[in-house]
């Protein structure tokens, strides 16, 4: 994993503007605004506000990106305060290799060692078998089905939680 960089715009476009990649997230996002999104993400990662990591399958080729995994805090929208959420995307040509699960586990291990994130929530689409399998395999607890608003769209998701300090076993 490496922090997002300003030259990751093409990877963002491939992930966020593609109808297949965004199928479970309500459809592709418009290309306009992606450059600004990358700049914001670079700033937030550099400030250590959010952990926005690019999945790099080969450290010798850091420009080859397989996807992204992100850990961030936000208001739960229901008056319950801040929650920590994790999300990930893996490009089609890299799917099925275990990279998503490894990236999520690695970021959760870093969160455990850092100690500031607390319980982590994940909201994969109800029909996203691979992402729900990652949650199961890493010890997330299934909370239930949950509507989530993303980019002005209401998504049908499964709500999972994990406490990295308690639920992750050391490798």
Tell me the role of every PLM-derived stretch.
Residues 124, 131, 143:
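Short histidine
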Residues 83, 100, 124:
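Charged, low-complexity surface patches
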Residues 114-123:
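Conserved GNAT acetyl-CoA-binding A-motif
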Residues 99, 116-117, 140:
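Helix N-cap/coil-helix junction residues
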Residues 1-93, 109-110, 114, 141-144, ...:
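GNAT-family acyltransferases
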Residues 89-90, 96-111, 129-137:
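Conserved acetyl-CoA-binding loop-helix of GNAT-fold acetyltransferases
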Residues 24, 102, 119-120, 143:
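A local structural micro-motif
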């Amino acid at each position: 994993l490496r922090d997002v960089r300003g030259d990751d715009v093409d990877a963002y476009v491939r992930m966020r503007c593609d109808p297949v990649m965004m199928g479970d997230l309500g459809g592709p996002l418009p290309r306009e605004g992606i450059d600004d999104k990358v700049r914001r993400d670079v700033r937030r990662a550099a400030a250590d506000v959010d952990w926005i990591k690019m999945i790099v399958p080969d450290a010798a080729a850091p420009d080859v990106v397989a996807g992204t995994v992100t850990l961030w805090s936000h208001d739960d929208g229901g008056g319950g305060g801040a929650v920590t959420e994790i999300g990930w995307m893996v490009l089609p040509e890299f799917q099925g290799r275990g990279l998503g699960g490894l990236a999520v586990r690695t970021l959760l291990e870093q969160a455990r060692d850092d100690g500031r994130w607390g319980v982590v929530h994940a909201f994969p689409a109800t029909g996203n078998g691979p992402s729900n399998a990652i949650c199961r395999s890493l010890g997330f607890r299934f909370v239930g089905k949950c509507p989530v608003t993303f980019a002005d769209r209401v998504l049908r998701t499964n709500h999972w939680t994990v406490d990295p300090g308690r639920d992750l076993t050391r490798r």
